[in-house]
Amino acid sequence: MVVRAFVLLALFAEASAKSCTPNKADVILVFCYPKTIITKIPECPYGWEVHQLALGGLCYNGVHEGGYYQFVIPDLSPKNKSYCGTQSEYKPPIYHFYSHIVSNDSTVIVKNQPVNYSFSCTYHSTYLVNQAAFDQRVATVHVKNGSMGTFESQLSLNFYTNAKFSTKKEAPFVLETSEIGSDLFAGVEAKGLSVRFKVVLNSCWATPSADFMYPLQWQLINKGCPTDETVLVHENGKDHRATFQFNAFRFQNIPKLSKVWLHCETFICDSEKLSCPVNCDKRKRMLRDQTGGVLVVELSLRSRAFSGLCDFSDVLLHLILMLGTWAVL
């Protein structure tokens, strides 16, 4: 009789345990920093708790962070490039880092749909083994969401040689003092998207540090429009690439710092549902309502896991795009 009571008590305790409310949106946020990769997914994806999700299928190191489960790859240096199963590939001068977050429940039965979010960051780099450091330019973000299907988006922030935006200029590059004030040409380009999706620059700014939140900033583009007459936006929201130019400059009175980092917050606009081109004389309400740095992609695709066409009209793929590149001035 005592044994039965114990079993009933255990069952009651299990049933009364509070579980999280399943979040069925395929969402992943990826921050590609020079030496660190941070990935976030909304809490409770398809009912999974943070302790049931593993980075690289190995490390249960996720933490709760403001409504998200956050996973960090803290060190991309050569001595630790396989952190928690992180895979890397080096094809000079490009370095790719790959990882994934998967559900891994060791219980007898699994009641939640498995999830598998894979992602990678691509760096244009000179990988200095002796210094364990990158030539610090974050160039491209690749993300795949794998819980209901697969999708890959690639975006890159590039410099160009002139206003035709046809020839890329490799960063970092050095400007002589006499070139301060000359025109620099930059753009964000998307690959792997259908023609209906357009690239929209929400904001671009420069810092003397790789940290995009560095307190000293010089704003170039705000809500899709130039902040002053020295900045010219060529295309924004019209094509798979958004382009602009600005005058070269350097930050004053900063000891031992001669690098200027350019950061852009970008999102993808569905031209079949929204008016994407940015009109700077009469700014669209859409731009005011967007949260900066978030790429929003609505998609329909065929998944190998299903026989028919899967409609993801209610699935948003969110990517935080903090592309940074620097010039030595």
UniProtKB/Swiss-Prot annotation:
Keyword Cell membrane annotated: yes
GO molecular function, one term: extracellular matrix structural constituent
Record SMART domains: ZP (SM00241)
GO biological process, one term: sensory perception of sound
Keywords of this entry: Cell membrane, Disulfide bond, Extracellular matrix, Glycoprotein, GPI-anchor, Lipoprotein, Membrane, Secreted, Signal
Disulfide bonds: 204-264
Glycosylation sites: 80, 104, 116, 145
Signal sequence, start to end: 1-17
Compartments it resides in: Cell membrane; Secreted, Extracellular space, Extracellular matrix
Residue ranges occupied by any ZP domain in the UniProt entry: 19-283
PTM notes: The presence of a hydrophobic C-terminus preceded by a potential cleavage site strongly suggests that tectorins are synthesized as glycosylphosphatidylinositol-linked, membrane-bound precursors. Tectorins are targeted to the apical surface of the inner ear epithelia by the lipid and proteolytically released into the extracellular compartment.
Membrane topology label: Lipid-anchor; GPI-anchor
Pro-piece positions: 306-329
Cited PANTHER family: BETA-TECTORIN (PTHR14002:SF13), ENDOGLIN/TGF-BETA RECEPTOR TYPE III (PTHR14002)
Recorded domain comment: Zona pellucida domain may enable to form filaments.
Complex and partners: May form homomeric filament after self-association or heteromeric filament after association with alpha-tectorin. Interacts with CEACAM16.
Protein name: Beta-tectorin
Native species: Mus musculus
